[in-house]
Amino acid sequence: MSSTLIVQLDMRTLCQEADVTADCVIEIVEHGIVEPSGRTPEDWLFDDQAPLLTRRAAKLHQELELEWEGVALALELLQEVQQLRSENSMLRQRLGRFTQM
């Protein structure tokens, strides 16, 4: 029997895991970088990917002095590049099967 473990973090835990302030998390949420469930910051729950995204967003904002809109765009483009690299790798493997015959 298999079971699925769903991890959800509240605001306090996310702030601790990502080493950011609650105000920073609110900015990140307002710009759609991380999307919690819940209506208010007190009720927000975040998935297990939120700490990594939050940390990356805060780092881009602080170290590169990007506006939050730029941070959102940069993270979206980085995710797209990662997806394209993954697809490219899969297609190369498929192609390799035909060229080795």
Swiss-Prot record:
Disulfide bonds: none
Pfam family, one: MerR_2
InterPro entries, per the entry: CbpM
HAMAP family given in the database record: CbpM
Family named by the database record: Belongs to the CbpM family.
The protein's role, per its UniProt record: Interacts with CbpA and inhibits both the DnaJ-like co-chaperone activity and the DNA binding activity of CbpA. Together with CbpA, modulates the activity of the DnaK chaperone system. Does not inhibit the co-chaperone activity of DnaJ.
The protein's name in its UniProt record: Chaperone modulatory protein CbpM
Organism of this sequence: Pseudomonas putida (strain GB-1)
